[in-house]
Amino acid sequence: MQNSQEMAITTLSLPKGGGAINGMGESVGQAGPDGMVTFSIPLPFSAGRGVAPALSLSYSSGAGNGPFGMGWQCSAMSISRRTQKGVPQYNEDDEFLSPSGEVMAIALNDSGFEDVRTANRLQGIPLPFSYKVTRYQPRLIQDFIKIEYWQPVKQTDGTPFWIIYSPDGQTHILGKNSHSRVANAENPSQIASWLLEETVTPTGEHIYYQYSGENQVNCTDAEIALHPQDSAQRYLARIDYGNISPQASLFVLDEELPNLTQWLFHLVFDYGERDISINKIPTFEGGTTGWLARPDMFSRYDFGIEIRNRRLCHQVLGFHRLEALNDRDVTDEIPVLVNRLTLDYDLNNSVSTLVAVRQVAYETDGSPITQPPLEFDYQRFDTGSIPGWQEMPQLEAFNGYQPYQMIDLYGEGTPGILYQETPGAWWYKSPQRQIGGDSNAVTYGAMKALPKIPRLQEGATLMDINGDGRLDWVITSAGVRGFHSIHSTGEWTHFTPLNTLPTEYFHPKAQLADLVGAGLSDLVLIGPKSVRLYANQQGNWAPAQDVTQAENVSLPVIGIDSRQLVAFADMLGSGQQHLVEITADSVKCWPNMGHGRFGQPLTLEGFSQPQTSFNPDRVFLADIDGSGTNDIIYAHSECLEIYLNESGNRFSKPISLLLPDGVNFDNTCQLQAADIQGLGIASLVMTVPHMSPTHWRCDLALNKPWLLNVMNNNRGAETCLFYRSSAQFWLDEKQLVEAAGQQPECHLPFPMHLHWRSEIFDEITGNRLTQEQEYAHGSWDGQEREFRGFGRLIQRDTDGFAQGTVDIPTHPSRTVSWFATGIPEIDTTLSAEFWRGDDQAFSPFSPRFTRWENDSEAGSDVAFIPSEHDAFWLNRAMKGQLLRSELYGDDGTPEAEIPYSVTEMRHQVRALPTTDATVPSAWCSTIETRSYQYQRVAADPQCSQQVVIKADRYGSPLLSVAINYPRRKKPEKSPYPDDLPETLFDSSYDTQQQQLHLTKQQQNYFHLTNDDNWLLGLPKEQRNDGYQYDQERAPANGFTLETLIASNSLIGSNQPFTYLGQSRVAYQGGVDEQPSLQALVAYGETAILDEKTLQAFVGVLDSKTRDELLFSAGYQLAPRLFRVESEPDVWVARQGYSEFGDYSQFWRPLSQRSTLLTGKTTLKWDKHYCVVIETQDAAQLVTQARYDYRFLTPYSLTDANDNQHYVVLNPFGEVIASRFWGTEAGKDAGYSTPQAKPFVVPATIEAALALSPGIPVAHCAIFEPESWMQKLTQHDVSERMADNGTLWNALLQARFVTEDGYVCALGRRRWMARHGLSVLMLTLLAEIPRTPPHSLTITTDRYDSDDQQQLRQRILFSDGFGRLLQSAQRVEAGESWQRSEDSSLVVNVSGTPALVVTDNRWAVSGRTEYDGKGQGIRVYQPYFLDDWRYLSDDSARTDLFADTHIYDPLGREYQVITAKGYRRERQYTPWFVVNQDENDTAANLAI
């Protein structure tokens, strides 16, 4: 028994050179139960001392517009007022959202009272006045952060801020200064959001976030006049980190913040203040022209104030203070740019989108070097490709005497047809999957009477009165006032009376609109200077409020002027209903500021009609282009004019949509917008009653616009993303449910666009990888108005669209995962879909609900059965948690429906009280995980389980058990395939397999929670014990937490066990002392020998001698942890000793040693404790390093033998040359020093290949990452196209070419779609070759002083996926094949490769063939070629022999067919693996 913990001793080394060409670290997120596409790009900042901003540029298909374009975000944590239940009132009734977006409530202290105190000090720093400090707790606890709201006791004393204590000991302050608050400019005490301003770590390191407020710079006079109160928005402008002087407390608590010279590193976000040309190095301070205004400015009003967004971030810049880092004179030092990420946009008046990001760095002479841009494109609304009208036969039965409406009556996310047959007789045709059409084809089911709806009478209407997302049938006739709700099954509920129907409900000017902002239909009467508001309270209305408007606001009144349309619509794209007035020559909008208040009117230019013919009844409002703003459709007799709303600022020029031949639109015609395609986008449906009723449809788009759908790295890889509406998945689900004779039940009443498929295409090899997702059981919580995700997700890792480089069938794996939605109506039915092919499998898990009880010093979870009310909140805490996962292989075999593995989880939800007695907080954890390894053998699985029996108050596991169930009893008949070798099944059984094994693990932790400390989960001690039982002792229904804590538990104190070991962590200050907040690990202690293992010495050494030897070897006797009765001590080893600096040294380690018997390795740091510059071992041997502080990477190393090692780094930190020199046998040896013989790495591969021997480096490298991009010059375009610069500037503006002339894949594609390409341009591009990204490394075999030096030249090509595509190494002269200019082999008259004797001879690696999953199938033999350039076609070879590797759906190699046709096979089973070589399989080969 030994469990050694070895400490990694810090060693100095130089970075290595060469290797594959990599991208910028971008990554696509895995599909999850929410169906969103996620993507992230790292920002160009260094790690500093190891504490750096945790930021990236991230995309989500569910995100809106912002400073980085549609869908993109880069924001630090924040706390905001909740707006989902209404516009904030800025009083004590407002709720707050945690950084994770959860509603927070005031927490309780250990005495059960509000955790509120008064304080005038923070982190030991006196504050200028007293604060009321209130601890808040999110409803859904994820990581046990501590959140405090600091409010001045006297409101006149200052402004409130927030403190967040992270479990890792970091302290964050939000909104301390005005620049980090989003607030009402006219009343700064009305704060909407508090933004992260500063972070301090336990080691005294700080990160400071600086924000810029919106202003009027570079805005037009019209923009300023319409939006004068524009300063609320905040933009992240700069992040400072790497403070020179440590400080335990937050800098913002001091009288003054440190000046900029006190920071070593800066990350700057540039919004157009600096030049964006790559040929001009951006300065730290920025230019004088100010930031740029975006064309798609937009505002949000959900906080009751206007938050105007006018800016786009154009670049992110990393700066270092190199003089300070190098310990040189810092007087007037200006930070130096070390990395740059440029952001290019497709600027659009409706929606601006990020289309490219590119890394740029600079040589010391200021010349730029670049990486290929990572490009993006989006599903777009193409005004030039709107299809024509087509008849709609689904409606042909309806005429003008049958009122009908396209409406989603059952809440399925796509509308059906509601119509009236005779007075009082209502029918509905729900949407169905169309049989025989394409996979998204929608039709309508058989008509279904709605018998339970009361007879339609005056005052009845369909509306969502309670805000649950479903329609209600509201009846407001005399004597009958109430509503029927519709259940997800389509059945109507019993009548619910309305107790507070306002008397003015029947007023002719009363309107229903969401003015409170809670998503409910409020009753409102509008006058010119006031609004009477009856707020909807989820089924009843509050008493009337008369809201007087501001002096400069006069509201339009409905019905006053027949020549104008007054309505509520989202003309501004903020997600709210605003008041709009449309006349023949103007559109005015009064922003909805919440609770009956409206802002000053905004005029949206661009819409006009002749005064004499304008008819408000011909105006229709709908979001046509998917931008979130309502567009205007005006119906003429012969056409529809569509005015696209440009981000709530203006309307575009109208698009004319001709009506079908012979159709004249008049007042008898009907026009409506509805999602009849089930794609989540609007189509136009027109009914023309004459001469005979005809119904038409026009699908304005086939895809939801503005979703990211293509990414191209310009290195050869393109990723395509495909979306599908949740309504389409529901129709699939509905079809299956109805086919099974069951009642379909939809719980997601609106469509969402979900990540359906992804394709990654390698443009170089033609390899195409695919992945597909299917979703079911969508869920919506109508009470909290939140999406809960999908209950089932099916993922396939390939499909029929995948393409390998060779025609080898590739079978997909299929993972079926079930997730909790927190809605019992869904979650309790999921188990019916689980695989049931193993009748001996244990029953599925059910959740456990507990309360935290302080019944002991440590506290414990006590199980309870929650009330129906509490169960709602505790179930909600499980949303998104994985319940079960089954892994299959869809290879078409009979075993395809038997899983390879099944994993299932059990969750525990701990209820934690808050001051809101109606809503508990909850923490969800996984307490049981059970895994079956079937390998498609249902009767003989391996089964294991992990159970967390007890966790402490902060969620750290204290007691857990790992269970390995015994193998099931041997059946009479083997369940394995008949082709297995004889006796294998019998011989696979072993008595150990029939044993039940349990391993108990006990743990303890340090939690530092006193005063201003908050550091959780520091490991303290751990012990493992093993239990072994006969097969019969395993419970028939399996283990659960309950069986393991029962009085007869198999891990009870009275059960025999085997001690398996222990470990303990000692922190600086001693084993039993509380560690400091810095948590400095002094050493680790591990048990090595116990009384059983010591039996090996019996008869060899007496106990006294043995103990003396053990003591002398450094072992110590220590008591067993978690000791049971009188257990003997164990021998332990202490390892991994460290000594640390003090506060002034940022608590950095100063020495390390493995044990006390070994010598120390001391560490010397640079002046600012960023990097180790010297190490000295126990023999006093010293290693020193000098650093390039652009990258915090060593470039020069003096080793223990005083030898010098030296590398040259390019501006991206890549090693491009290395050399070394020193002594050998007491004499100078090695390469010439850089001072004696400088060496400049050639700029191109051609120049490097021309180098002659005698170069003073051991290695040099040249990278060509942009070689897959064609390169144009302005001269080429001007000469071929007779261009005077106009075309070239247009190409630059359209991102067809980069500033340095590289042709962008997606920019070119967009240009071709909009403008096409002339023959001359196509010819020019065809003449420019594309070469896969590649690099050259030159390695010398001896020093430059030796005239026999040889240069080994090796070139590596990468494919689009970053895999090695081809390698070429220069060899001696001889025979080789020839490469033609079209990248194929030159052949002779017989069609075989032609041979030539050449001095330019290269050994080229053979081609690798891949299957549809990107797995290597064949690797062919290398060959000689007379050129190093990439050979794309070697089909002329006659020696294409290779083994063929075939994989199962999980990607495991199961068969190899050798080049001679023999086979090696491997078969996987739950308990053994069968390997057969060529001799074993020879008998099965066809002769």
Swiss-Prot record:
One of its GO terms (cellular component) is extracellular region. Toxin complex is secreted when grown at 25 degrees Celsius or less; at higher temperatures the proteins are present intracellularly but not secreted. The keyword Transmembrane helix does not apply. Its main location: secreted. Keywords: Secreted, Virulence. The keyword Secreted applies. InterPro entries: Integrin_alpha_N (IPR028994), Sal_SpvB (IPR003284), TcdB_toxin_mid/C (IPR022044), TcdB_toxin_mid/N (IPR022045). Disruption phenotype: Cells with a disrupted yenA1-yenA2-chi2-yenB-yenC1-yenC2 locus are no longer pathogenic in C.zealandica larvae. Residues 389-698 are annotated as: 5-bladed beta-propeller domain. It is found in: Secreted. Residues 27-378 are annotated as: SpvB-like domain. Residues 389-698 form a 5-bladed beta-propeller domain which closes one end of the shell; the other end of the shell is closed by the RHS repeat-associated core domain in YenC2. Semipurified toxin complex consists of at least YenA1-YenA2-YenB-YenC1-YenC2-Chi1-Chi2. YenB and the N-terminus of YenC2 form a large hollow shell of beta-strands. The shell is closed at both ends, within which the C-terminus of YenC2 is probably found. The Yen-TC:K9 subcomplex is about 26 nm tall and 22 nm in diameter with 5-fold symmetry and 5 copies of YenA1, YenA2, Chi1 and Chi2; the chitinase subunits may be solvent accessible on the exterior the complex. The Yen-TC:K9 subcomplex has no insecticidal activity. In the N-terminal section; belongs to the SpvB family. Part of an orally active toxin complex (TC) with strong insecticidal effects on larvae of the Coleoptera Costelytra zealandica, Acrossidius tasmania and Adoryphorus couloni and some Lepidoptera larvae. The TC has an endochitinase activity. This is Toxin subunit YenB. It comes from Yersinia entomophaga. The gene is yenB.
